[in-house]
Amino acid sequence: MDKLEAVTGVGQDSILEVRVKLVDSEPEIWRRFELRGSLALSQVHQVLQAAFGWEDAHLHRFVTSDPFAPLRPVDGEIPEVPQWLPQQGCEEPGDKPEEDCSLDQLLALGHGEAFYEYDFGDSWLHRLELVSRRSVEEGTSPARLIDGARRGPLEDSGGLPGYEEIMDALDDPGHPDHAEHATWVADMTGSDEPFDPAFLDIADVNRTLAQLL
């Protein structure tokens, strides 16, 4: 048993039902997965990238609590908050390699929840919530998307405020920025087809996940 396993009590593999939402999105952008608890966080990163339509073009991290919530002093000092990053990005004392921590271990440390931040500029913050667990059955996929709503925002759209502004302009042909934003969206998506923020192809996501893991 390794040190992290001893702390979390996590050992035997399970299938975890995990709900992931993009924090503060309205209407809510969310996904519900069945994931093996033994998946390394580096693999969970790949799953979230595929499911939300990200392009893995920016930095990311996992943490056990909201990274933007005020911290309470402990014995008069602000506690160090650990974060899990790709091994090559670990530079600070609280940085831990995401390759060495499993999803089950992270959720145990966070008492059933965790956060994944992608793109520290736009700051796309995802909240992971453990819904249930069951034993692993033969032939169970390591990662499967079972439900969700709405496509993920476009890369480099300026966080949720910027993305919502772009969507508002697209939805209003009379908006002064409609043409500019329509051109930008077409460039980003590589398509002149109308952009539908409500679209989500679960089957396509699962095909991608099957190739990744």
Task: Identify the meaning behind each predicted range.
Residues M1-L213:
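Short linear regulatory motifs enriched in tryptophan with gly/pro/ser
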